[in-house]
């Protein structure tokens, strides 16, 4: 018998494409694990996580390094630690025990590592979770159907028409003032951080505008702290934006009580007081999905576009006997009404880019936002 360890993963806010393919992921910035609370309470929250997951951090015995042993280790990790098994059973009939029987039949003692990887990756894809990955030294499995089966609703060549040649860029943000005096911000990845002072500069410059478009289409996530930092510029009071539960035992429904998540107004910073339209598509995932959940409760905000890609579980990682790593969602995130956001968040105004508009170099979603903001001004 060999041993296996379960480790907290610091890459929650990232889509699979943003994962660094390493055998083990080290926590570099503890605040990136849980940005849902203010930094003042982070230390307390971190101790809560450690206490609740202490049993998962203790060395456990697992089967030997064989195809069957690695299969059993992976299946058990998901069975005891993955946080959406019961929810997905209700949503689309996921039966993890049936999955075990079906995929076990595909194992052979003499199968290659490549064949084993294929079987295990396909088993994990049954979870329909973009935050679940099997990682070797050379390969990472990915579940892509959370966006593959949907319209793109974003064309970068058309977006560049709106930005123009004289747009400004700070950190990961590009911004411009459109001809109808509507401010336009594009934030394509929360992996590209923007500092508080730079954010002040952007909002100050756009303060002359009648409304603001905040476009996060194709934002696959990144730093969760960016979700909280941006959202804090759109409220003047502490506001409840959601809840988070922690896995407390091996049962599919072993969770802590829901812990409230708040966004507090950015103190001594520029805050936006006018209407704002947040643009989304299916590629808005993970921490971008979390940002939309926060903005949903802001009274001056309207979400426009397509349903987001989801990805709301707080990920952990574990190691198999052969050294492969698995990332999985371990703690569910809910919106302010205690609804799951794992499969995405519906917009307030659902609209897709039309073929006619695209042929004319127009973005239907941006145009819808401009029309709305003009109406709100009147």
Please report, for each region that a protein language model flagged, where it lies by residue:
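Positively charged n-region of N-terminal signal peptides that target proteins for export
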Residues: 1-5
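Short, aromatic- and cysteine-enriched interfacial helices/patches
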Residues: 8-12
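A cross-taxon signal for low-complexity, glycine/charged-rich
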Residues: 13-32, 40-48
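Flexible, low-complexity junctional segments that flank or bridge functional domains
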Residues: 57-247, 254-260, 275, 317, ...
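C-terminal "post-core" interaction segments
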Residues: 58-79, 114, 182, 220-378
């Amino acid at each position: 018998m060999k041993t296996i360890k379960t480790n907290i993963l610091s890459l929650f806010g990232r889509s699979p494409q943003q994962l660094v393919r390493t055998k083990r992921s080290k926590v570099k910035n503890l605040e990136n694990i849980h940005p849902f609370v203010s930094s003042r309470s982070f230390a307390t929250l971190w101790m809560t996580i450690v206490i609740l997951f202490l049993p998962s951090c203790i060395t456990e015995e697992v089967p030997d390094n064989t195809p069957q042993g690695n299969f059993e280790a992976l299946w058990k990790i998901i069975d005891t630690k993955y946080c959406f098994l019961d929810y997905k059973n209700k949503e689309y009939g996921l039966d993890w025990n049936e999955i075990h029987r079906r995929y076990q039949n595909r194992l052979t003692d003499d199968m290659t590592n490549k064949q084993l990887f294929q079987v295990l990756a396909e088993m994990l894809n049954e979870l329909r979770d973009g935050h679940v990955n099997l990682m070797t030294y050379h390969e990472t499995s990915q579940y892509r159907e959370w966006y593959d089966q949907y319209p793109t609703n974003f064309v970068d060549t058309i977006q560049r028409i709106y930005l123009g040649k004289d747009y400004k860029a700070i950190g990961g943000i590009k911004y411009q003032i459109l001809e109808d005096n509507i401010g336009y911000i594009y934030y394509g990845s929360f992996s590209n951080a923007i500092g508080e002072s730079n954010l002040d500069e952007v909002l100050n410059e756009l303060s002359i505008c009648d409304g603001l478009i905040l476009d996060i289409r194709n934002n696959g996530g990144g730093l969760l702290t960016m979700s909280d930092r941006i959202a804090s510029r759109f409220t003047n009071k502490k506001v409840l934006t959601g809840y988070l539960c922690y896995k407390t035992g091996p049962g599919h429904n072993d969770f802590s009580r829901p812990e409230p998540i708040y966004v507090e107004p950015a103190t001594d910073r520029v805050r936006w007081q006018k209407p704002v339209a947040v643009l989304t598509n299916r590629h808005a995932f993970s921490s971008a999905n979390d940002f939309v959940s926060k903005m949903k409760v802001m009274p001056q905000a309207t979400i426009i576009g397509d349903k987001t890609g989801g990805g709301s579980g707080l990920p952990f990682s574990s190691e198999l006997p052969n050294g492969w790593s698995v990332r999985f969602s371990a703690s569910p995130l809910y919106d302010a009404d205690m609804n799951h956001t794992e499969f995405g968040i519906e917009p307030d105004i659902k609209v897709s880019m039309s073929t006619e508009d695209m042929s004319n170099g127009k973005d239907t979603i941006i145009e819808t936002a401009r029309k709305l903001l003009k109406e709100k001004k009147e």
